Amino acid sequence: MKSKLSDFIAGLGLCGILTTFLFCALPAPAHSQSQSTPKAAAISSQAQKSFSTPQDAAAALIQAVENYDVPALLEIFGPDGKDFISSADPVRDKSVGAAFAAKAHEKNLVTIDPKNPARAILLVGNNDWPLPVPIVKKRGKWYFESKEGRDEILFRRIGSNELDAIQICRGFVEAQQEYASEVHDESGINQYAQRIISTPGKHDGLYWQNQDGTPGGPISEGIARAIEEGYTFSKPSAYHGYYFKVLKGQGPSAPLGQLDYVIEGVMIGGFALVAVPAEYRVTGVKTFIVGYDGIVYQKDLGPDSINIAKNMERYNPDKTWHRTDDQWPAEVLANAD
């Protein structure tokens, strides 16, 4: 039986579409992709592309998103849009782009502001979701006002990623509890998993492959591999904007004080997880930690968040960490069921 972590993340297929329009706003092509190629770098320094009509601007955006055309998006949004079309999570970005394009093909409409004829808004989908970046008329041409939309887009994306990270932390606790309810690898003792993906031939992680090739463990292979990438910090792709790391000990501020979770090679003293944004103030702001009691704490570790998390070995929720009660809206989770 898979844990609710699997159910929750599997449901993000639908939630991803919902949050694209509720929180994330626009697709965010890979940060490395937008900066690493000479063509993209050259485009980002050029003047922003203009259009004869707001309808032409909207059509160009929809086509660029549908084709996942990073250079075209940089042209359309200009230098002020560079940040919000850049992310460390290209897999999710492409998925978000596909969802946006699908909604745009479902229905799209450009409306002129009745109080300002030089300002237009693109509405997409049957629910007429408004793009947070307005289209404005300057000197006889129409442009996307990227500077105005930038902060709102980043705010929505960060909020979405942080809520996902909190839910994954909570699901990790449930998965560990399910794992420890059985004895694995003929160890003769109930213990917690020290890994996300098991060593080949063993059941020492939250996911493993059975001898007949079928998946085993409290989480699915897809979820395990996605989180494992974040756990290792060795891949350019984060999972929903966050990296994750299993902690194998706790500090003096944790319940029962400082102790090691691993005793003679067996993790029986507890477990903990840290979730850190892949790009500070781009994919997330807060870092989250959770222990075996299931309480998620948050803290803004600043621009050096990722290095602090890399070096973090113990779960230590001192007074600088604060409990979070942030959750996905009930209606969003209900739609994921």
Regions from the language model: what does each represent?
Residues 81-131, 233, 237-240, 245-253, ...:
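Surface-exposed, charged secondary-structure patches
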